[in-house]
A protein has these predicted regions:
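Short, conserved phosphate/pyrophosphate- and ester-handling motifs at nucleotide-, phospho-/glycolipid
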Residues: 165, 250, 341
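Fe-S ferredoxin-like electron-transfer domains
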Residues: 19-26, 30, 96-153, 158
Length: 369
């Protein structure tokens, strides 16, 4: 009898557990069903969206693309916009990317804000110029053991207008164990005067979802979508001397700028410091040397931090900063364009301001990592 009673109790508890689980599923579905909601943009435009998704993805579904270098993972802080009503409380995941003044001005990260009620936001008008493009891969070049150059030919008569230095967000396709598409940001390396195709330079990042797809799965003839152009890192139209500093795939936007300057026939004094570990990490050297012949006053200076014995390297070594003294003629008439890791950007910026007297507002950079 006791054994039978135990069996009955277990059956009863199991039934209760099933009922509770069912109720929780129904409740979760009911609570997460926010229905149709309105996103008001700049007090001018209303969008009707299905609630429950992030503000970033909700806008993307309506072909409004806010910059997001990390693809909405909350790790880049690029998708900032003002949320004046309906955004809910500021999340701990947002605070590291927002200054005190930004928080006081209702700035939020669009990827962290969930659309759970009608919401009012402010975004720059330039965002409306960002589009989704369709392309075909027409060329893949191995620049080094871990860097490729890829050419995307636009389809359906599409053209793209961008400034030298800007970037696009590449949409991956599912592959292997990666079942969903992701978006990652890459700088355009081609000149803006060619508007029916773009070139990107992409370095393989270990276990990187997008770079693994590009290096191991992407092939000529594949169809690929991307959005853009994005970014405030672009060449300023002045007569100031230029100091370029980059490393690795950071050569991409600098190459775009140099190609553009070649087209317009600039007379500006330019120096380009390219940081690498060994000679295996140097690429497009002949093209850089061709710029030295083309421009009236351009110098390409590669600097190796860890040259190997068999490199037979006779050039500059160590950090790039000590060599800036060769290039900076007039700090008050010099602009710097930096592209590389956050650590490199911070170190170079500090040196330019403290050691060489450049104004911080004349230092432009594209930080990735």
């Amino acid at each position: 009898m006791m054994f039978l009673r135990i069996i009955q109790d277990i059956a009863l508890m199991s039934s209760v557990g099933v009922v509770l689980a069912f109720v929780m599923v129904i409740a979760q579905r009911w609570l997460s069903n926010y229905g149709e909601l309105t996103i008001n943009i700049n007090s001018k435009k209303d969008l009707t969206v299905t609630g429950g998704s992030s503000l970033l993805s909700s806008l993307g579904e309506k072909q409004i693309f806010i910059p997001s270098a990390c693809g909405g993972r909350g790790s880049c802080g690029a998708c900032k916009c003002k949320v004046n009503e309906g955004g809910g409380p500021l999340l701990p995941t947002e605070k590291p990317y927002l200054s005190k003044s930004e928080i006081e001005s209702n700035v939020r990260l669009a990827c962290q804000v969930k659309v759970k009620s009608d919401i009012k936001i402010e975004i720059p008008d330039s965002i409306f110029n960002i589009r989704r493009f369709h392309s075909e891969i027409v060329e893949i070049i191995d620049y080094t053991y871990d860097i490729k150059g890829i050419t995307f030919k636009l389809l359906n008569g599409e053209t793209i207008d961008f400034k030298a230095g800007q970037y696009v967000q590449l949409e991956t396709q599912p592959y292997a164990k990666v079942k969903q598409s992701v978006m990652r940001a890459y700088s355009i390396s081609s000149k803006p005067e060619i508007n029916d195709s773009i070139q990107l330079i992409i370095r393989l990042v270990p276990e990187g979802i997008c770079t693994t797809w590009v290096h191991n799965h992407l092939k000529q003839g594949d169809k690929v979508n991307f959005t853009g152009p994005y970014g405030d890192f672009y060449l300023r139209d002045t007569d100031a001397d230029i100091l370029f500093v980059a490393g690795g795939s950071g050569k991409a936007p600098i190459k775009s700028m140099l190609e553009h300057l070649k087209v317009v026939g600039t007379q500006r004094k330019m120096s380009y410091f390219f940081g690498a570990r060994t000679t295996k990490d140097l690429y497009l050297t002949e093209e850089m040397q061709s710029y030295e012949k083309h421009f009236q006053d351009f110098h390409y200076i590669p600097v190796l931090s860890h040259p190997e014995a068999d490199d037979n390297w006779e050039g500059r070594t160590g950090f790039v900063m000590p060599y800036f003294k060769e290039a900076i003629r007039d700090p008050k008439n010099t602009e710097a364009y930096l592209c590389g890791s956050p650590g490199m950007i911070a170190g170079v910026t500090k040196s330019l301001v403290e050691d060489y007297g450049l104004s911080a507002d004349k230092i432009y950079y594209d930080s990735f990592g």
